[in-house]
Amino acid sequence: MTTKKYTAAELIELEEKYGAHNYHPLPVVLERGEGVFVWDVNGKRYFDFLSAYSAVNQGHCHPKIVAALCEQAHKLCLTSRAFYNDCLGPYEKMATEYFGYDKLLPMNSGAEAVETALKLARRWGYKVKGIPENEALIIVAEGNFHGRTITIVTMSSDPDSYGQYGPFTPGFVSIPYDDTEALKKVLDEKGDKVCAMIVEPIQGEAGVYVPHKGYIKECYDLCHAHNVLFIADEVQTGIGRTGRLFACDHEGVRPDMITIGKALSGGTLPVSAVLADDEVMLTIGPGEHGSTFGGFPLAAKVAVAALEVIRDEHLTENAARLGVIFREEIAKIDSPYFKSVRGKGLLNAVVTEPQNGIEAWDICLKLAKKGLLAKPTHRHIIRFAPPLVITEKQLREAIGIIKDVFESL
């Protein structure tokens, strides 16, 4: 039996005909990846400057991670948490020691990790802080992106995320991002019923919005002054992406809870987790939260390998060094379509000046033709986030492509 070889156009048409229309991809059909590169079905090579929204920090198909995946897949994939397995405990030990927390609660997607953190925060609020049941509040920031579930879109200020999905989950207070005075006002007025604040140290989907220096520390201090948990959503910013293990590390902040995902598996499986100390984590007991796949042997084995790659190959340090080069060089672009560049480490964004009918989407199409893949967020911002394994030589080649495209518009 022979397998039909589809053309790129046919593959796009298959998705259009048989798949839900909840994404608007660039018209590129990929079939292979290695390191910082991906290849389409026609054999064309591209720099990957999206990294699956920072899930592929270790590069595509990293041999160590793939080897761990294949070895465990031949041995045991799934048991559920009804039984112990020989992979989860070693993973939890390695991860908690590496990240510096008492406990890890394994989940699958980033949204699941966030939902888990919200449940833990409310449980802590009732059992430890003494908030009257069903009255706990959680503070969120405008412009956030924490996931797509009903509860999480309740927290969103983006109509595309929450429009016509109501009614929404109560118990959230939204304040402007990067505004500690707004946080102080809410805590002064309602702090006795606030169990937590959840925030992204850098807002990725909002356009790699980097808050003012000291913002995260100010939020942390205000929360602790009111006996409120500080939760950092590091699903996109964590695991080396910003040039530190966690983006919060730039300000010396150790959150009460951290959500992680994406690069936790090196882009091979949906693997996420919540990190917290015993006071928070042990408020949930057996049967009170769980996941069939959370912590399954395959995920545990892959996560250990993925974290070892980050640590042993010094990818965090590489992100810090090359991020400076990227921003310095991109800032030199001479084009009326270029406005500014911002970011930390290898999580960066270019703010464009749409004009003459050319927006960020059109620029991304031109970048793809030149062999570099990036994706716009909103109409005027392009996120650039290559795998952290990128070399300086590769980075400078990619910068050349970006400069050429902007300066030829």
Please provide the spans of the model-predicted regions.
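Conserved N-terminal phosphate-binding loop of PLP-dependent enzymes in the Aspartate aminotransferase
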Residues: M1-L409
